[in-house]
Each structure stands twice: as structure tokens, then as C-alpha cells.
Swiss-Prot record:
Pfam families: Radical_SAM, TRAM, UPF0004
Name of this chain's protein: tRNA-2-methylthio-N(6)-dimethylallyladenosine synthase
Organism, as annotated: Acinetobacter baumannii (strain AYE)
Entry's EC annotation: 2.8.4.3
Reactions performed catalytically: N(6)-dimethylallyladenosine(37) in tRNA + (sulfur carrier)-SH + AH2 + 2 S-adenosyl-L-methionine = 2-methylsulfanyl-N(6)-dimethylallyladenosine(37) in tRNA + (sulfur carrier)-H + 5'-deoxyadenosine + L-methionine + A + S-adenosyl-L-homocysteine + 2 H(+)
Gene behind the chain: miaB
GO molecular function: 4 iron, 4 sulfur cluster binding; metal ion binding; N6-isopentenyladenosine methylthiotransferase activity
Chain ranges of the Radical SAM core domain: 178-410
Cofactor dependence: [4Fe-4S] cluster
Key words of the record: 4Fe-4S, Cytoplasm, Iron, Iron-sulfur, Metal-binding, S-adenosyl-L-methionine, Transferase, tRNA processing
């Protein structure tokens, strides 16, 4: 599980997994909000929007210190059992803060809230508000309701739980997103209709619902006008996007990419998370036609064994996946590929695992999110017999991660002497003459340059490999501002 604590611009992050926010103030008269984000980039996006909502409606500013907050919000993830239990562990710590400050408001959102709203009320009755991913836009109203009934007797208080699955109305109530830096996430759809046997997402975020095309394009155009140069399109099954057009038609994901690429100012496009079934030839063609598309793709496969894929109800074979990647790499030979792997799925044999390990070697993955299978209540896979010892699963996982780590090291080393297109994001904290940016493949690139170049793209020749994710280079060409 990734835990991301929202911190203000200029503050030091406690870890790499942080998201910066508007400048923090020590003025005690200012109402302060602390958000802990667990899990995926969709949750990260949602947490940004929570901060925007409460900032606009009630004047809250973000703090990186839960001890000084007036509101504590936890945006939760239920993808694995360990992540779910960590929610209650953290809530136990927050309970102590509420005992010290009875006026403290505690809210729980995200997928655990959606799945276990009633259970949260029972196990943590001190939680004041519970809301799901599709109802976060109602946070200001829930907060008002909470304050309105603070003085009421306990038996007269209304339980503030809203974990329903309304249509994608939340985007109609969200304020204009704040811009921080030159990258931005844009959610284009919610939910998933694939119903893989191991996954809780359809039950916690609902069926697939796409945002209208015009809404998506308007949000991205607004971000570009504010200086954003890289857009990451988000969805649980993002390439299944089918947004309604103003004329009443349907826009597919490849068509959306082409329209976004036409927006002035947008110089780089990413997206996550995809499903192989909708990784179509039309989508692959975008990599040939649109220079804004990065040579980096996250395409979850989960297993390299057809038997396991069938049990997972992924509805495709390994050959289908391999064929799609072959087509893509014919267009982009330098394509960096990442994926998700579930190790130790019920019924996975030694032979099945060997197939997965060989598949990983053959496809030459650059990165992965790989975990031992975690049984999720209510999913079909939770009823499957699981006879593989836990220590065997962990040994298999270690093998997978070692193979992918070695591949990643080799890919970083191979950058030496090559030219990378880099989005310059900031001046180094250590040296005002050094600029820091990211390459298509997500590696950090540093080089000597002028602070006025921040926000532009540059061609950098890589001259030194520093670490797995950090390289040094020299400027070859500074591109004109794409705005």
C-alpha cells in the first residue's frame, strides 16, 4: 500500500510518496485540513479534489501535521487485506487525537469506506463522516450537518454515512482544480465492469461510467492555460472510456487522446490503468501518430499463465497480450513496459509460476506492482481453495521482483549516451544551477541550466547513471514553450 500525506509547497516530505499542496500557514486562526491518501492514483486525484472542495467551501488549508488539524480525512484503499486493516490501526491513533481535542472532525472516504461503512461505524464510532469515492463532492454538506448536530443528544444525531453509487455527478460539483507544478491528473471515468474474480473495485467504485467528452476537454484546456504541460488520464479501466459528446455521440479512448493532443500547451500524455482487452489497434496507432504519447505504458496482466488468467476471469490469453505489446514495440522500440502481478493466486502451481516468470523475462518489464494474493471478501476468488503455503508465495514473489529489478537496472544503464526528452520541473534544492526533470520513462534527469527554463521540454544527452531512477545529462536542445 502506498501512503501519501498531503504536504504544502515548500515543506519537506517525510517520504517519496507525497503530494504537494498550497502553502501552509502557522496562523492558528486558519482552519486546517490533514489528508492521508492510501493506494492508487485515482485516490490521489480524489484527495486533491477533497482539498479543493473544503478550501473553496469552508476556507480550510492543508497541513502536514495531524496534531494541528481541525479535520482529519483518510482516503482509503481496499485492494489488499493488509491495507484494509491498516485503516483501523491508523484510526486508533486518530482516536487519541480526538480524545485530546473533542472538536476534531474525523472522516473516512475511499474504497474501504464504500465497502465497510457500517463496520467502520461499529469498530470506530468516533468517526464523524463516512463517504465513498462517488460521493466525496458532498463533503461540504456533510461537514455542515456534522457541525449542526454537535450539541444534540447522541440518540438524536444522524449517522453521516454516504457510500451510494450515484451517476458521475460528483464532477458537476467539484471546483476548478488547483494547479501545482507542470503535471496534472485528470479523471475521465469511474468504476470497472470487468469483474475479475479477485478484485473489489466494481463493488467499491461501481460500474464503469465515463465523463462527458466536453467536460474532460474543458478541464484539460484549463489546466494547460495555467501552465500544465503533462496530463495523466485516470480511470480504473481508462482505455474503456466511452464519453458522451455534445452531439449525443460516443467518443472512444483513442479518439479522446487525439483531441487532447490538439490542446495548445499539452506536450506529454500518460494514462493509467488499462486493461489488455481494450488495448486496441486504434489505441496502438496513437503511439505512431501522436508525439505527445510517452514511450512508457502500464498495462496490468496479473499472471503469465493462461490457467491462472482463466481463474482470474481476465478474459484474454497470454498470446493476446504478447501480440499487442509486439505491435506497440514495432512502433516504439524504446517502449518501457510496467505491469501488475498477483503471485500465489489460488490454484497457482509450480508450473504456472514458472510460466509467469518466463513471461516476465520475455516481455522485459521495466517496473511492476507485484504482491502476494490477498483474499478479498465478496469476490469469487475468495471461495477458491488455496493450498499453496504462504512461504512459497513469498519466495515466488521475491523471484519476480528480483527479475524485474534487474531488468530495470539494465534499462537505466542503457540510457547512457542516449538522448531523452525531459520535462523540466524545478530547480534543484541543492544547487540553483541544476535543473531537475523527468524523462518519458519516468527517470529523474538532472543537468546544468537556467531557472527560466522550468516548465519547458528539453533534449538531454545522458552522461552519467547515478541510481536506478536518477541520471545526469547535458542539454542539447531547449524546445520552445509549447503554450
Amino acid at each position: 500500500m502506498t501512503v501519501q500525506t498531503f504536504i504544502p509547497n515548500g515543506a519537506k516530505a517525510a517520504s517519496e510518496n507525497t503530494v504537494t499542496q498550497p502553502t501552509h500557514t502557522t496562523d492558528v486562526s486558519i482552519k486546517k485540513l490533514y489528508i492521508e491518501t492510501q493506494g492508487c492514483q485515482m485516490n490521489e486525484y480524489d484527495s486533491h479534489r477533497m482539498a479543493d472542495l473544503l478550501g473553496d467551501s469552508h476556507g480550510y488549508v492543508l497541513t502536514n501535521n495531524p496534531n494541528e488539524a481541525d479535520i482529519l480525512l483518510m482516503n482509503t484503499c481496499s485492494i489488499r487485506e493488509k491495507a484494509q486493516e491498516k485503516v483501523f490501526s491508523e484510526l486508533g491513533r486518530w482516536r487519541k487525537l480526538k480524545e485530546q481535542n473533542p472538536d476534531l472532525v474525523i472522516g473516512v472516504g475511499g474504497c474501504v469506506a464504500s465497502q465497510e461503512g457500517d463496520n467502520i461505524q461499529k469498530r470506530a464510532p468516533y468517526v464523524d463522516m463516512i463517504f465513498g469515492p462517488q460521493t466525496l463532492h458532498r463533503l461540504p454538506q456533510m461537514l455542515d450537518q456534522h457541525h449542526a448536530q454537535v450539541e444534540k443528544p447522541k440518540k438524536e444525531k444522524i449517522k453521516l454515512v454516504d457510500i451510494s453509487f450515484p451517476d458521475i455527478e460528483k464532477f458537476d460539483f467539484l471546483p476548478e482544480p488547483r494547479v501545482e507544478g507542470f503535471k496534472a491528473f485528470v479523471s475521465i471515468m469511474e468504476g470497472c465492469s470487468k469483474y475479475c474474480s479477485f478484485c473489489v473495485v466494481p463493488y467499491t467504485r461501481g460500474e464503469e461510467v465515463s465523463r462527458p467528452l466536453d467536460d474532460v476537454l474543458a478541464e484539460i484546456a484549463g489546466l494547460a492555460e495555467k501552465g500544465v504541460r503533462e496530463i495523466s488520464l485516470l480511470g480504473q479501466n481508462v482505455n474503456g472510456y466511452r464519453g458522451e459528446t455534445f452531439e449525443g455521440g460516443i467518443c472512444t479512448f483513442p479518439e479522446l487522446l487525439r483531441l487532447v493532443a490538439e490542446i495548445p500547451g499539452i506536450g506529454r500524455l500518460r494514462y493509467t490503468t488499462s486493461h489488455p482487452l481494450e488495448f486496441s489497434d486504434e489505441l496502438i496507432q496513437c503511439y505512431e501518430d501522436l508525439p505527445q504519447m510517452v514511450s512508457h505504458l502500464h498495462l496490468p496482466v496479473q499472471s503469465g499463465s493462461n490457467d491462472v488468467l482463466k481463474a482470474m476471469k481476465r478474459n484474454h490469453t497470454i498470446d493476446v497480450y504478447i501480440d499487442k505489446i509486439a505491435k506497440l514495440r514495432k512502433i516504439r522500440p524504446d517502449m518501457h513496459l510496467s505491469s501488475d502481478f498477483i503471485i500465489g493466486f489460488p490454484g497457482e502451481t509450480d508450473e504456472n509460476f514458472a510460466e509467469t516468470l518466463q513471461f516476465i523475462k520475455d516481455l522485459d518489464f521495466d517496473h511492476s506492482y507485484s504482491f502476494v494474493y490477498s483474499k478479498r471478501p465478496g469476490t469469487p476468488a475468495s471461495d477458491l481453495p488455496d493450498t499453496t503455503p504462504e512461504h512459497v508465495k513469498k519466495e515466488r514473489l521475491a523471484q519476480v521482483q528480483q527479475v524485474i529489478k534487474q531488468s530495470s537496472i539494465e534499462k537505466t544503464d542503457a540510457m547512457l549516451g542516449k538522448i531523452e526528452r525531459v520535462l523540466i520541473e524545478k530547480v534543484s534544492d541543492q544547487d540553483p544551477n541544476i535543473l531537475v526533470g523527468t524523462a518519458d520513462n519516468t527517470r529523474l534527469v538532472t543537468f546544468v541550466g537556467d531557472a527560466s527554463w522550468v516548465g519547458r521540454f528539453a533534449e538531454i544527452e545522458i552522461t552519467e547513471i547515478k541510481t536506478l531512477n536518477l541520471v545526469y545529462g547535458e542539454l542539447l536542445n531547449l524546445e520552445p514553450d509549447v503554450a
